[in-house]
Amino acid sequence: MMSEEASGTVMGNKERIVTLTLEMIYLLTGEHYIPRKKSDDGGALHAPGSVIQKENNKNDKKILELMSNIIQLLTGEEWGCLKTNTISHGETKKENPQQLYLPDCDYEDKADININLNATVCFDNESNTNVDKGANRWEARNVPKSEFLPEEQPCAANSIKEESELCKAEYRPDCSFNPLGKQIQGTDTPTANVGSSMNSSLSDNYLLKTIKEEPDSCEEEKLSDYKIITVSEPVAEDQNPAPSCSQNNRSLPNYVSNTIKEEPYDEEHFSDYRIITVTDPTQVAGTSPHSTENGEYDSSMAACTSQLSKSALNVMFNCNVCHTAFNNKSNLVRHQRIHTGEKPFSCSECGKCFRQSSQLFLHRRNHTGEKPFSCSECGKCFKWRSLLIKHHKTHTGDKSFTCADCGKCFKKFSRLTEHRKCHTGEEPFVCSECGKSFAQSPQLDLHMRIHTGEKPFSCSDCGKCFTQRADLNVHRRTHTGEKPFTCSVCGKGFTRRTQLNIHNRIHTGENTFTCPECGKCFTQHSHLLAHQKGHMGKKPFCCSECGKRFRQSTQLYLHQKAHAGEKPFTCAECGQWFKLYSILVEHQKCHTGEKPFSCSECGKCFKRHTLLTEHQRIHTGENTFSCSVCGKCFTRHSHLTAHEKIH
């Protein structure tokens, strides 16, 4: 009779523990599960109820009370430390680890079972533990830490025995050992599966759960994951197999996930309900994820973890032609078009093909004329950003590239490279027609147009053609009247920079070109050549109308206008016509009374510079023109001509 009452009490306690456990799971996950007995086909199903929204920080006290009742039913003793929220059980039991003798068991070999309150160890008589990677995360703040220790060793005493030393690192059948050391809840990490050599019946399993309070500063992500699995069919051992390594004939502990397994309820097999929690040891400061309980480093575990991380991460895509690695498959596809020559993007206007859509997008600007990049200084627009950057250097005057030989600076490195050939004398580009060499390829291309007679650039106003675009741009200034180069002294404008440089010699008095016959100096080389023809008596330019010869082509051009009677330049004041524009300018000074040329000796002013030069000979006494008959000298050539008529 007493045995039946005791048996009924035990089964009542078991049913009470199951009820309290499921209620605690409901508070943690918000899911309600109802246990069922095994059906005829051996399957067990759970009927989830309505899922409610979890409320953070409100169920902690209720969970503590439920766990205290469960432990009281298991051990027959009430744990007072669970009633406080300030001291975690792991901290109070850390210095004095206790041993647990579970009730209603026969303790045969009297071996002590050590409990590490900071570890999580799962005992199972199966060789492998299923890894559930899909554990649902429950996000409740300050929920107490759960550590479950299912004991498989039969025991007789219903008491807790304190022991002075911890379990050793070896895997003893009478000792629960966690090689991962201290752990923090909330992540999926490996948990040791120890005690597989214990042959006790599954019905003798009991559940011990310790509670550890987390401070208020705990974040939601640090809390454990829970999930209920209905074990209706045998779980294949090769599902999600855990990697194993061997070192010193010791196997790596199996990996398990943060799951709660729900197995069919039986009156004789209460321990079919097994709760397993796994925490992450890597989040504890000062601990290693591959260290054992006594602080030793487990190299076998580290090697397997490293191998897993390399296979799961670092996924690279390699080109099978040049073996270039890419971290994105789309980049590999674009790269392989270089080897295959594929150009899938074609322009609808001209049919030109491109490897990338971005290249086609930029190409379309040639047809649309779009210039989205504008200069903030002058407002000039460009199609490409690179052209805008180069243009900005014209405003800033930036010349980053300097020649090491002469110190000349350039805006582009290509210009510096071309300039260096002047110092080295290198002229690798040779004309096949005449053998002339050039330092740059564009110079050779321009030179070849002399032989071919090609003039691709034509003026839209007069139709005149030119071999270079620069010559065409200069020519257009004659139609527009643009003179961008201005003298800083007198303000006179010129269409070319070379003309401005020659004009500046008038103000500086520089006469670079000197006649070797008479010593006369000239500011331009063309003037010196024309002067030297006077000494030689050479007059190569002949008029086809009257046969008169001239030393310069400009003189012949003006003479031919006299035969044609052409006088294109007209004075707006008096209507007089002139052959040359320069003569018209001098004539207009008669109407304005302007005499810009003054004598520095007497202050007399003249309309022309030639008149001032003749006047200055009076002060200097210079008589340049002398009579060949009597030797009389004159300051003007006209006076000498009149004198010669006397003889």
From Swiss-Prot:
Full protein name: Gastrula zinc finger protein XlCGF48.2
**Where would you find this protein in the cell?**
Nucleus
Q: Which GO terms describe its biological process?
A: regulation of transcription by RNA polymerase II
User: By its UniProt entry, which PANTHER family does this protein fall under?
Assistant: ZINC FINGER PROTEIN 160 (PTHR47772:SF7), ZINC FINGER PROTEIN 200 (PTHR47772)
Origin, by domain of life?
Answer: Eukaryota
User: Record's SUPFAM superfamilies?
Assistant: beta-beta-alpha zinc fingers
* SMART domains reported for this sequence: ZnF_C2H2 (SM00355)
ZnF bounds (C2H2-type): 317-339, 345-367, 373-395, 401-423, 429-451, 457-479, 485-507, 513-535, 541-563, 569-591, 597-619, 625-647
Cysteines paired by S-S bonds: none
Supply the InterPro entries for this chain: C2H2-ZF_domain-containing, Znf_C2H2_sf, Znf_C2H2_type
Q: Name one Pfam family in it.
A: zf-C2H2
GO cellular component assignments = nucleus
A molecular function annotated in GO for this UniProt entry is: zinc ion binding
Major location (coarse): nucleus
* Family matches, as Gene3D superfamilies: Classic Zinc Finger
The family line of this record is: Belongs to the krueppel C2H2-type zinc-finger protein family.
Q: What does this protein do?
A: May be involved in transcriptional regulation.
